C-alpha cells in the first residue's frame, strides 16, 4: 500500500482503505433502513440490534467527510493550490461520476410508481403501507419528481424524503460540488485551513439558528463537515511547516476514539441537543481516523486493526459498488419486506429474514446496477478497480 503512494506521489493518488470505509458505511445504511417489525412490538432480543442501527446518520457524515477529503487531495498535493483543469472540466467529471446512476435509479423508482398506480387504478390491488414500510414510497407528486430531477429536493421538508429517501444526500453533495471551488477553496487560499472550517460551519448554522429551521432538511452544517474532510487532506499532505508539525504531533487515533464517544453521547435524544452537534463530532472522528490511517500507511507502520478491516478485500470490493448500493437499496428492501409480510412467519423469523434476505438481495441488485448503470460512466482510473481482481488478489495472497 505504501509503495502505491510513493510511486504515484505526483500522480493520481488512491488509498484503497477509503473504498473499504465507504463500502462498510453503505452496508450499515442498508441495515439501518431494514424495517424488521411486522407492525407490533419487536421481540425483546431484537431491540439491541435495533439500537445499534440508530446511528445511520454517522454513515452519511462519513460520506461527506470522504467527499471533502477526496476532492481536496489533488489540491493539497498540488504546488499552486488549485483544481486540476478548469472549473467546467471539474464539474463535468463530478457530473459524469454521480448523475447518470442517480437519474437511472430515479427513473426506475418513477417506473415502479407508475406500475403501482396502474394496478391501483385498474385492479383490486392497493398498496399496503404497513407491508411496504421503508425507504421507498410509490406515492409522490409531480413536485417531488421535478425537485428530484433538478436536485433541489433536499431544500424543503415536504420533498426531501419522498420517492427514494436516501437520495436527499446526493442533492446536498451535488450542491457542495459548486461551493467547494467557488467559495471554500478561495477562502482556504486566502486565510488558511482554520478559517475555511470556521466560516463554513458559521454559514451552515445560520439557517437553523436565525431562520426558524429554513433549509434544515438539507443539513446545511454538512458544509462545515465537508471542510473537515478538506482539513484531513491538507494536514495529511501539506508541506507547510505548521501543518506538518500538527500531523506529526497529535494522537490522531486517540482523537478519533474520543470524538466517536462524544458523537455517541451527544446523539442521545434525552439530552435535547441539535443533531448538528453529534454529527459534527462524528465528522471530526472520521477526519482524525483518516489522518491516522493514512499516516500509518505512509510511515510503513504495522497496520492498526481499523486499517486491516478497511483494507480487507471484501470491504474494498463492497466500496467499489457502494454508490449503487446506496441508490438502490431503498426500493429493494421495501419489496423484500412486502413479499415477506404475507408469508406465515413469526415475528422472529420475519425480522431475521428482513435483515438476511433484504441485505443479500440489496447487494445482488446493487452489483448488477453498478455493472450496467454506474461503471460505464466511471473514469478509466476507477474502471481499473474491478471487484474480481480484488478478490483474486486476496486468494493469491493467502496461497
Residue positions per predicted region:
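Hydrophobic alpha-helical transmembrane bundles that constitute the permease/transmembrane domains
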Residues: 20-23, 34, 55, 174, ...
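His/acidic/aromatic-lined binding-pocket segments of jelly-roll/cupin-type domains
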Residues: 61-63, 224
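Alpha-helical transmembrane segments in multi-pass integral membrane proteins
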Residues: 2-17, 27, 31-56, 72-87, ...
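Alpha-helical transmembrane segments and their helix-entry boundary regions
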Residues: 18, 90, 98, 169, ...
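Residues within membrane-spanning alpha-helices of integral membrane proteins
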Residues: 19, 23-26, 67, 99-106, ...
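Membrane-interface helix-loop-helix regions
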Residues: 102-170, 205, 282-295
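Central hydrophobic cores of alpha-helical transmembrane segments
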Residues: 195-204, 256-259
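Membrane-interfacial loop-to-helix junctions in multi-pass inner-membrane proteins
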Residues: 12-15, 82-103, 122-136, 176
